[in-house]
Amino acid sequence: MEYPIPTHLQQFLEPVGEENSEYEVTGTVRCTCGCKNFEVWQSNERQIIKLVCKQCGKEIQLFDAGKHGWNGFVCGDDFLDRTLPFEKHTCPDCDEDVFEVTVHISSQGKQDFLEECVANDDSFSGEDWVDGFEWITVSLTCRECSGEDQEWVDLETM
């Protein structure tokens, strides 16, 4: 079974649960070092999100609305102000800054991408379907107090 895990997240997103399919996947972010604890940084009203691993310091680009999802990847809509600084997210309950990150991706599926993009534009291939997703939800769980924000980011990307 192929899941709609975007190319840039394939080495980091571990699917969890029984509900994953070609049309949606939920997973926990894990660094290549094995750590699941991250600082969360955002810019452009959470339109650009990066994670920094608390164990090894690796930066992971989680989402960039100008590059990822249908509008960013397929349409090339990049309206973001890339001069804006990143801001570190802290837990609203305890003010700590270490989180476990869960991501939910929704997709129209591979066949839709083949019909809409590959059939009409030679710049796309069949493997690109995972990058043209329609929705992303990012959930954060504070590692200090276990406070949860189930929809810290909840964005339609098409």
Segments the model singles out, each with a brief description of its role:
Residues E2-P15, E24-L51, G57-F79, E87-D131:
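Short recognition patches in nucleic-acid-associated and regulatory proteins
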Residues L84:
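Extended, positively charged loop/linker patches that create polyanion-binding surfaces
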Residues A119-M158:
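Acidic, proline/glycine-rich low-complexity IDRs
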